[in-house]
Amino acid sequence: MASSLGKMTFPRAADKKLLTDLANRSFENLMKEFERKQRELQRASRTRKEMIVSSQAILGLKKPAIAELSSKAKARYESALAQRPKAGALRPIARASTYGAGGINYPPYSFPWNGGISCGGLSTCSQYGPNASSGQIGADLGGTGATSASSWDGIALWYYSQANAPMVISTQAAVYGQGYANADIYGYVYAYGDLELLVYDGSGNQVAGTVNVIYDQSGSFIYNNTYFNGNMYTANVSVQLAANQWYVVYVGSYDYVDLGAAAGAQVNLDTFVQQIAICDSCPG
């Protein structure tokens, strides 16, 4: 799973080397956090799948039967995709970003970042971005059978603090697509997608972070089919900032699919980050 930072846009008169170094340090720590989260999800999925395999053995379910159930799961998955409505078009907001001057920041943002995508054996596996010009992030992960996949990408914004004061940061995103999770009693599915907001200081260390879960379905003997057509999601954090210091605000989309036999899933979250609002010296 390759990770990378995209082309950066810098505020006027800013020290480009300083900001580039900040981006590199913070992104390195961001990836460590991603790897930790990935391990936790994989460990939880592995434990649940082992329980299902044990149940199959206890019930005497033989391989031919499992193959038949897997075939039925694939048919249900393909039927759900065929019925999915087409996502509506979202026009990017045509306003220039203030690049960390405070207030509401619209696209274009400072730079895109990509934590990478791992497709496993999924039949559908692609990213929508990341695109700092439009704020488009997210991925389309889907398929059937025993496999797993994940994607993590987003955009980022510079912020310069002029005083020692509390800072409130919020982001708003519109989501288009579909969340689908289906598993037979002998199958297993874990389908997950979220919106993340993370803040890093001038040393590249995380000082605040939060997650808003958009889609989360897991287990066996489960069926869920949810459509998104411009659904709005927000995330916000509060952090005490230091004077005369640069910060970098990351907004990301993390998507994950893990499947056992006789299961299908789709995490298709085409996400547009519409704004990042920054309020310093906020009351309360």
Where are these regions (language model features)?
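Mature extracytoplasmic or otherwise solvent-exposed domains
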Residues: 2-284
